[in-house]
Design a protein with these regions (language model features):
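Cytosolic regulatory regions built on CNB/CRP/Popeye-like sensor folds
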Residues: 1-180
């Protein structure tokens, strides 16, 4: 079973019970499983296939229109830009941030090829968490490990991004007195 890293602090029996409590879904290539900003009450586990996690941002592009006879107008054109954050394969979970925070989803998740996922209802999970404090501790410890790993990965990716332009802070010159 490839779910060892997802719920690694749970026993095999507990992991299987979680998966068995969920609804299995098959999604065709290109199918959106979760849309950014949606309310989600549960967690998905990838059983087979691969999903793409994308974060969309609103952008405004400016264009000069109606040029002619020395006249032009600046028009703002709203749009959306999606950035692939990562891909997740067999055994990976998604929707966990929304579950933990009880907040809208932070990304769109799309099937790369045909995918099978299990959706574990949040009410089912919360009932188990409320009824078994030991399970709750192991469950949240497992989520913390997953989230920590993803944060480390994001930090590594961010190291390659360098700000440019006049707003880039410069290191302080030790020879110069500090402004007070």
């Amino acid at each position: 079973m490839a779910y060892d890293t997802t719920f690694m602090k749970l026993s095999l029996t507990e992991r299987q019970a979680l998966l068995d409590s969920g609804a299995r879904l098959r999604v065709k290539a290109g199918g959106v499983i979760v849309r950014q900003g949606a309310r989600l009450n549960g967690i998905y586990v990838v059983i087979e296939g691969e999903v793409r996690v994308e974060h969309g941002i609103h952008v405004v592009r400016q264009a000069v229109v109606n040029r002619g006879k020395g006249q032009g107008t600046i028009k703002e054109i709203p749009g959306r830009l999606s950035v692939e954050v990562r891909r997740l394969g067999r055994g990976a979970i998604f929707g966990e941030m929304s579950f933990v925070e009880d907040a809208p989803t932070s990304a769109t998740v799309t099937a790369v090829g045909e995918v099978e996922v299990v959706f574990i209802d949040g009410g089912t999970v919360r009932a188990k968490l409320d009824g078994d404090p030991s399970f709750a501790a192991r469950f949240y410890h497992s989520l913390a490990i997953v989230l920590s790993g993803r944060l480390r990965e994001a930090n590594k990716q961010a190291r390659g991004i360098r700000p440019r332009g006049p707003m880039t802070p410069r290191p302080a010159d030790p020879a110069q007195p500090a402004d007070e």
